């Protein structure tokens, strides 16, 4: 599963990292969204 990141200011999307499991991807998204202010992380 790909975790994507979107720059909030411009809406630009970037492939961030690929995870083997949905659980790992969800955990990463939760952690990343709590620490990154200018980026929004989500699962594609």
Regions found by a protein language model. Give the residues of each.
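Short aromatic-glycine-(Arg/Gly/Cys) micro-motifs in beta-strand/loop hairpins
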Residues: 1-15, 42-44
């Amino acid at each position: 599963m790909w975790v994507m990141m979107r720059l909030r200011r411009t809406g630009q999307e970037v492939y961030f990292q690929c995870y083997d499991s949905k659980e790992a991807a969800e955990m990463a998204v939760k952690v990343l969204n709590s620490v990154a202010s200018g980026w929004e992380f989500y699962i594609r």
